[in-house]
Amino acid sequence: MPRVRERTSPDLIRADCVSLSPAEGRHEPLEMQSVFDQAWAAYNGRHDAMTLGGETMMVHRAGAGYPLVCIHGWAMGGRSFAPQLALIDKGFEIIAPDLPGFGDSAASKEVPTIEAMARLIRELVSALDLSEVTLVGWSMGASIAWHMAATSPASLKALVSIDMSPRVAPEDGWAFPLSSGMTRETIELAIQAMRTDWKGYCDLFLDRILADPNNQIRTALAALAGQADPETASQAWLSLMQFDARADLPQIQVPALAIHGGRSVLYPQTVGHEIARLMPNCRAIVLDHVGHAPHIEAPDAFNAHLLTLAKRGPPAPTLCQHITAQ
């Protein structure tokens, strides 16, 4: 079992906090930091540049204990897992890399496919000599987590996917693609828009993440999106459209949760039931009042489910459960 280090922790940090004290050494004035940056500073987060497979990635870390390796969504960064820092006080270490071309990591030398990014996460786990890892993937990060768990399960203890479909692109007979009405033509138009007007495209995308308006969280998400390299983002998006995890899911044996937002406008909430049907040791949970970012919009409920999974495996009886998140 990983050794847990004693620590003195600040107050529980939620995604909607506004008055957090930065740790020593932060150079930005408090009012200029996003709510995510404030949380990482308050929990004395470390930000380490690591070279893995010829790529240099920024890896955000805080705490000590059972490792939670958190893989961010498309156009985002590792700091988006700030609401999970509260789990440090439950004996966990949060490890949240910025994938190449996102957050504080430079663009990749190779095409950023889902498979290539999964290899980088595997190399990160190996380089840090981690064991009993709970892998957490948000959106695109879930695709990466599924592929890694199916192809490189060593060192993994559990897996959590956040509001994602195993097949994003539309396909005859497939009921769970990204946003009903999407076509091959709209996919091409989206990629073109990313390359020509990244900020404009991000503004439209960010409007679809949260179920309810929250300026502080949206500003924090926008700051992360603004750091992304548009060409990397467009290539990753194309890979996401081509990727199909349906063959991966039956190969994943670790205990797993598929957590979805009941008000997500990106994916139908019923996709969680399909994921749990395909994955032998998975349970789907729908947090009724949240959108595409359950870990940010309902951190207490999300963290409680993650804690139960990481310590005891998935709760047994029902395949899919709807929960009203407070």
Locate the predicted segments by residue.
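Catalytic histidine-centered segment of alpha/beta-hydrolase-like enzymes
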Residues: 290-303
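Flexible "cap/lid" loop of the alpha/beta hydrolase fold
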Residues: 146, 150, 156-193
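Conserved HGGG/HGGXW glycine-rich cap/lid loop of the alpha/beta-hydrolase fold
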Residues: 55-107
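Conserved alpha/beta-hydrolase catalytic His-Asp/Glu region
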Residues: 170-178, 192-250
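Conserved acidic catalytic loop of the alpha/beta-hydrolase fold
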Residues: 116-133
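Short beta-strand/loop motif that positions the catalytic acidic residue
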Residues: 252, 258-260
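Acidic catalytic loop of the alpha/beta-hydrolase fold
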Residues: 263-267
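Alpha/beta-hydrolase fold catalytic core
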Residues: 1-68, 89-93, 130-131, 283-285, ...
